[in-house]
Amino acid sequence: MQFKFLKPLLKPAKTWHNRLAWLAFISLFIWALSGLLHPLMSWTGPKLAAFFPPKAVLPASLVSQVPAVLKQHQINQALLVKVVPSVNGAVLQVTQDELAPRRYFDLSNYRELADHDVEHAKWLARHYTGLADTAIKSVTLQTQFDHAYPWVNRLLPVYKVAFDSPDGLTIYVHTETNAQAGLTNDYKTQVQGWFRTLHTWHWLDDFEYARVLLVGLLMLVLVLSTLTGMALVLSIKRSAKATWQRNVHHLVAYAIWLPLLGFSGSGLYHLLHAAIADQHNGLRLAQPLTWQDDELNQQIWSSKELGFMLNGLSLIRDPQGQLIYRLSLPSNKAGKGGHVHDAVKTTGKDEHRHHGHQAPQRDAIYDGIAITDPALYISAKTGLQVAFNDEKLVIAMAEQQLGLPLEQLQGTQLITHFGLHYDFRNKRLPVWQLDYDSKLGDKVFIDPATGILVDRLTDNARYEGYSFSFLHKWNFTRPFMERTTRDVIMSLVLGLAMLFAGLGIVLKIRRKAS
């Protein structure tokens, strides 16, 4: 196949393709080989025994015990106050410092459970790994990212729980959300180190400008080599006397030029965006809660009215500054609790359900399923139910925390599954997505149970995210292909690309020798 309009480009394309050959070959091998390490870690690394947090089944009557515990222990300020399941049953969890261990209180006798954050982390570690009897070698509170727990995991602080196992199994757990934040062992940590060394060049992190410049130039070489090579293929007629290496190189070019251009182009875009663009995303806690004892009424409804079960319970402030309890109900209780969400707005297909299919268990960690849906609110001061809902709450929080006015709000959506704009690294479900017609084109994600701003996505970040998700990670295949199948196909393409590059170098060496 020939395209005559490309003839004027033939000479410069040939010149630059030859000049860039060695750099392109080295660059492709570095990133293709290291890229193969990513699915390798997924296939051969340690596996979770449980994909979701321990199920919370809490009696609603616990809400009346919260003010008594706080008053007895003279707690009048906290970042987060919530009731969570634990090894000892339902306990009150109080977060007073963002990076310090959380405090826990027994709701049956109001006593503080000393150093329980560590015990809670151990319990979660055993839940997720299924290692009920294996000894735990160490438990460490980690407040910074490192090579074994890189920044892409997002959650801090976490507990690093190391088991006394032959493979050095280690799990990172986030006690506020009861989430697993990462699972590794000696083998995976080593492979991950190779990946970060070869793929992201983290060894140059202390010289960021040099890293961006070198990686960017090599990626640009790959882009130019791909484009000039394809120009040659489309403008030169194959000779009947060509060697088999040249014929294979020519034919393989048709198959891999587009994926190769997608990998290198999206990688370059990702690198430059991370280095240059303003970063607006990231978890942000709500303003600290402060209160006086008389703001917490111990008379919460009647025991009869609280005779139902909850998925979660937390203390937050409404937009007027009044303390309220948020009681998260199982979905089948929505009609019985006196309040049902009627404000969920969705458009088109639910992008978070992947066309309604139940995700295979191995993909469950990436899709997520929210088990806490509707909620009702009780005034902490009066003990009576208030007419309020999650949508009103998160809209007010976005205005208070980010200064995003109601006039710019274009739509709201309850997110119950991980997807394109809100991925599994955030760990929290459900959250509310708020879309704003702001200068930055904000998509804001807020956890209604705690008031935490989980993520903020601007137009610039969204466009780069589309590029990286579709062209670099091939997530466009998710609606019709399982993750493992996708990874196998991507690995075959990378292997073919290395063969293609190797043949190109063989041709260059032979041409020079002749």
Task: Name the predicted role of every residue range.
Residues 2-514:
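Conserved histidines in hydrophobic membrane contexts and catalytic metal-binding motifs
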